[in-house]
């Protein structure tokens, strides 16, 4: 009888190559540096009306059910909320699945949204901001565009006013701290 010899080392290399080539779309990473909502403000459960990155600015829509509201695109004059759901990965057998940049809130899912207040400070990864030039400039402002941020030299005339107050360098990327100067309501 012929015995089949199984080469575990070769199989391990083949499998590692397959899994190591998994690539996902990168998303915004957000941190609640100094949000009033983490202590005494409102934290809403919102049903995502579209795919939303953590760090997106939305407004509250209609009541859905048991403490859940619909989310809606932010518009000047509406109350702004910061989408920031704890990034829990259910498939954590590979390092790639554990990287926070691959986490997002899918359309139809329930996400966490923090009510924003004047003087709140939060942090978003650099890919959240569409820069005027090569990189966002500390001291400039951002406007909300499709839920994320577009750099502007001056504060917006209407809507929430967010100022870029600090660039933060990390080993794996760059983030910017944003200061809520006005809610624009």
Tell what function each PLM region has.
Residues 2, 7-185:
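Surface-exposed, low-hydrophobicity beta-strand/loop segments enriched in small/polar/acidic residues
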């Amino acid at each position: 009888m012929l015995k089949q010899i199984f080469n575990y080392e070769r199989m391990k290399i083949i499998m590692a190559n397959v899994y190591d080539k998994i690539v996902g779309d990168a998303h915004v990473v957000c941190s609640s540096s100094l949000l009033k909502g983490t202590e005494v403000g409102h934290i809403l459960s919102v049903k995502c009306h579209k795919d939303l990155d953590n760090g997106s600015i939305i407004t509250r829509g209609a009541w859905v059910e048991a403490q859940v509201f619909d989310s809606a695109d932010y518009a000047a004059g509406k109350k702004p909320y910061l989408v920031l759901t704890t990034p829990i990965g259910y498939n954590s057998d590979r390092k790639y699945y554990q990287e926070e940049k691959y986490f997002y809130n899918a359309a139809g899912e329930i996400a966490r949204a923090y009510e924003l207040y004047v003087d709140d400070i939060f942090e978003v990864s650099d890919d959240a901001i569409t820069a005027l030039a090569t990189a966002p400039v500390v001291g400039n402002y951002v406007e909300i565009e499709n839920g994320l941020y577009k750099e502007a030299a001056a504060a917006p005339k209407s809507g929430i006013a967010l100022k870029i107050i600090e660039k933060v360098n990390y080993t794996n990327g760059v983030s910017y701290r944003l200061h809520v100067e006005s809610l624009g309501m």
